[in-house]
């Protein structure tokens, strides 16, 4: 049995004074020795925290004693250690940002909820568009079979992508999904206000689908990206597969790294061998960038040799 747990949760509910709430909530979390990242806004709370089983259970009881969060659903993962290094509770304008001119309130408008078994039926329906509401790098390590991959690197880019592809989506049945459900609450509501009539969402997100006793994560390929030190977690309990491809050679890979150029910081899938071979950098420009955090520890001679091994050279001004 694991000694730690990771809790993923959200709740759209009114928080009148997010700044004060954030300070008090941070103090409570630290007292329980939790670590994680929580966003609070007047529209609600969005968090992921880790801690011992005892501490996380205490936190869930603590939240249940607040009428605003009494019915909040927690997605619980077993863990061997903390999934975060620190504890942050931050007030924000939104708990998930679409940066719309006119914000959408999921308590007033949102897509129809599909439970996991209903969502699985939608996956098998050729007349339904399954739309991934996550970022491209999340999709690349794992996604539902047949899902559409929006070319976005940030959630707030999604409405623009929809507008650019409106013709292909017009008059279609749209079912959207995300990690835990929070992004789809707002995004599906926006779709309805944007003129799409038949809009549904996976209730509880991928995390709930993967733990459902009936679906057992079936029709999910790869792993689910998570925003903590675990990076990715398994979902499909029936017939798991690997869909991630190494950025450098296209071989199967589920290991994410960040480009060593801090001005890039792009997330790429790479094996340990290719990380070393390509100096943990996504391009030649990033490899030779003066701020590169990987190459700064190499002597000029070794740097030159490593570049020559991949048919690259230092820029003249550096030589």
Curated annotation (Swiss-Prot):
Please state what class of enzyme this protein is.
oxidoreductase
Query: Where is the Rhodanese domain positioned along the sequence?
Result: 124-218
Q: Which GO terms describe its biological process?
A: tRNA modification
Q: Which Pfam families match?
A: Rhodanese, Rhodanese_C, UPF0176_N
CDD domains of this UniProt entry?
RHOD_YceA
Q: Which UniProt keywords apply?
A: Oxidoreductase, tRNA processing
Its EC number is 1.14.-.-
Active site (catalytic residues) = 178 (cysteine persulfide intermediate)
- Single annotated GO MF: oxidoreductase activity, acting on paired donors, with incorporation or reduction of molecular oxygen
Question: What reaction does this enzyme carry out catalytically?
Answer: uridine(34) in tRNA + AH2 + O2 = 5-hydroxyuridine(34) in tRNA + A + H2O
Q: Which HAMAP family match?
A: TrhO
Role: Catalyzes oxygen-dependent 5-hydroxyuridine (ho5U) modification at position 34 in tRNAs.
What family does the entry list?
Belongs to the TrhO family.
Q: Which NCBIfam families match?
A: PRK00142.1-3 (NF001135)
Name used for this protein in its record: tRNA uridine(34) hydroxylase
Q: Which gene encodes it?
A: trhO
């Amino acid at each position: 049995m694991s000694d730690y747990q990771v809790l993923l949760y959200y709740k759209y509910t009114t928080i009148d004074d997010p700044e004060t709430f954030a300070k008090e909530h941070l103090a409570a979390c630290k007292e329980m020795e939790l670590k994680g990242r929580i966003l609070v806004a007047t529209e609600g709370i969005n968090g992921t925290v880790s801690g011992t089983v005892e501490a996380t259970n205490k936190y869930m009881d603590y939240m249940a004693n607040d009428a605003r969060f009494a019915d909040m659903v927690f997605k619980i993962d077993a863990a061997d250690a903390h999934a975060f290094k620190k504890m942050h509770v931050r007030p924000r304008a939104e708990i998930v940002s679409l940066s719309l001119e006119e914000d959408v309130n999921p308590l007033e408008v949102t897509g129809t909820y599909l439970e996991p078994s209903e969502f699985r039926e939608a996956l098998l329906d050729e007349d339904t568009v399954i739309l991934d509401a996550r970022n491209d790098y999340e999709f690349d390590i794992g996604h539902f079979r047949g899902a559409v991959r929006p070319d976005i690197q940030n959630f707030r880019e999604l409405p623009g992508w929809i507008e650019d592809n409106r013709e292909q989506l017009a008059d279609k049945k749209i079912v959207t999904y995300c990690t835990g459900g929070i992004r789809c609450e707002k995004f599906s509501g926006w779709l309805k206000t944007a003129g799409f009539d038949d809009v549904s969402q996976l209730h509880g997100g991928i995390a709930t689908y993967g733990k459902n006793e009936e679906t057992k994560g079936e029709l999910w390929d790869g792993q689910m990206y998570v925003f903590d030190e675990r990076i990715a977690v398994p979902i499909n309990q029936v017939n798991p597969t690997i869909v991630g491809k190494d950025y450098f050679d296209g071989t199967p890979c589920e290991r994410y790294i960040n480009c060593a150029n801090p001005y890039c910081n792009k997330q790429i899938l790479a094996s340990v061998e290719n990380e070393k071979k390509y100096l943990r950098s996504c391009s030649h420009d990033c490899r030779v960038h003066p701020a590169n955090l990987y190459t700064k520890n190499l002597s000029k001679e070794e740097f030159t040799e490593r570049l020559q091994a991949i048919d690259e050279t230092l820029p003249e001004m550096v030589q």
